[in-house]
Regions:
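Hydrophobic alpha-helical targeting segments used for export or membrane insertion
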Residues: 9-15
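Short, solvent-exposed loop/beta-turn-alpha elements that line the ligand-binding surface or hinge
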Residues: 48-50, 202-204, 272-279
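Short, glycine-/small- and polar/acidic-enriched structural segments
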Residues: 24-160, 172, 176-182, 198-199, ...
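Pocket-lining segment of extracytoplasmic ligand-binding domains
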Residues: 81-82, 152-155, 159, 164-253
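Conserved C-terminal helix/tail region of periplasmic/extracytoplasmic solute-binding proteins
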Residues: 291-323
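Secondary-structure end/capping motifs
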Residues: 220-299
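Sec/Tat signal peptide C-region and signal peptidase I cleavage site
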Residues: 18-22
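Bacterial N-terminal signal peptides that target proteins for export
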Residues: 1-9
Length: 323
């Protein structure tokens, strides 16, 4: 009888443990970009943090937002403009951290010998629609009094393509220049079919900060798990900042499966370093620039102070003794 009771208690304990473990799953949406590598690495160390992370890769940040709205994700890694557009469109999210800075570069065909934005007049420029690169491109064109549209007739003709297709378009001379992300812009330069014109960090946005967002339900309703995830994010990011060899190997071998070289990675991260922080001021400046340039076409732009929440990040950094 004692054995039966004992086995029953063990079985019940296993069921309870399984249920608790299921509650610890965090659904993460991410992008396949070099500076998103530390976010991918979270899933590798997640068991040490007491959670399990299920990562899903998307083509662009707006797709991450759609998955959040559909209830398919708890956490998303995007550029700030996708998060802002998502919040404006009803996505129930809060910004909780930044994880990389920069990550944009204007690259042109070497034979054109372009040295500044003003020389884009009469050219075809590729960019990914709705990405932070589009915001920065439109801001730089406006600073140089250049009009732009996807239809011919403006100073600059825009060609909208996914990040993965921009390099091929430049290589095949379908476009003259591109505002590209990393590591793709570094690849174009290192392989000789692209030349840097400029890094677009002279606008009010400065270096764009990539944003980590959580759903309000996850942030408020599963706070202990959200805290564990944030600590795991900080640990993963610190590992990549402190151990560049680890970061390079993981991004090249695991994220890109050998598609980029060590030089590509080094050059990419030099232009998009890993980081932790984000501020309401930065999100507001990006929001204001989106309104000014018309990217996102938001009816009611969200106020940054209403949805930037960095308390979990601050607590995680303090507990791990990171300034």
């Amino acid at each position: 009888m004692k054995n039966v009771v004992g086995k029953t208690l063990v079985a019940l304990a296993l069921v309870a443990a399984t249920g608790a473990q299921a509650d610890e799953v965090v659904r993460l949406g991410n992008l396949k970009l070099a500076h998103f590598g530390a976010v991918s690495y979270i899933k590798e160390i997640a068991p040490r943090c007491g959670i399990r992370v299920e990562e899903k890769i998307f083509a662009k940040g707006l797709d991450v937002m759609q998955a959040i709205i559909a209830g398919e994700l708890d956490v998303g890694a995007t550029a700030s403009e996708a998060a802002i557009s998502g919040r404006a469109g009803g996505a129930p999210i809060v910004v909780v951290a930044g994880f990389a800075r920069g990550g944009a570069r204007l690259v042109a065909r070497p034979d054109l010998k372009l040295t500044n934005v003003a020389q884009l007049k009469g050219k075809k420029v590729g960019v990914t629609r709705g990405a932070i690169q589009e915001v920065l491109l439109m801001a730089e064109l406006a600073r140089n009094n250049l009009s732009a549209d996807a239809m011919p007739g403006k100073d600059v003709q825009l060609v909208y393509l996914p990040f993965a297709d921009l390099n091929g378009a430049l290589l095949n001379r379908q476009i003259d220049a591109m505002m590209q992300s990393e590591p793709q812009s570094s690849q174009a330069i290192n392989r000789g079919f692209g030349m840097e014109v400029m890094k677009p960090y002279g606008t009010a946005i400065g270096e764009p900060v990539r944003t980590m967002v959580m759903t309000e339900q996850f942030y408020q309703g599963r706070k202990p798990v959200a805290e564990k995830f944030m600590r795991c994010f900080v640990q993963a990011t610190r590992s990549f900042i402190d151990d560049k060899a680890l970061a390079s190997k993981y991004v090249r071998d695991v994220v890109f499966k050998g598609q980029i070289s060590a030089d590509d990675f080094d050059d990419a991260i030099a232009n998009s370093p890993f980081s932790y922080d984000i501020t309401p001021q930065h999100i507001q400046a990006t929001t204001d620039m989106m309104v000014k340039t018309g990217v996102g076409r938001m009816r009611a732009p969200p106020r940054a102070q209403d949805w930037v929440r960095t308390e979990l990040l601050a607590a995680a950094k303090t507990s791990l003794q990171i300034k």
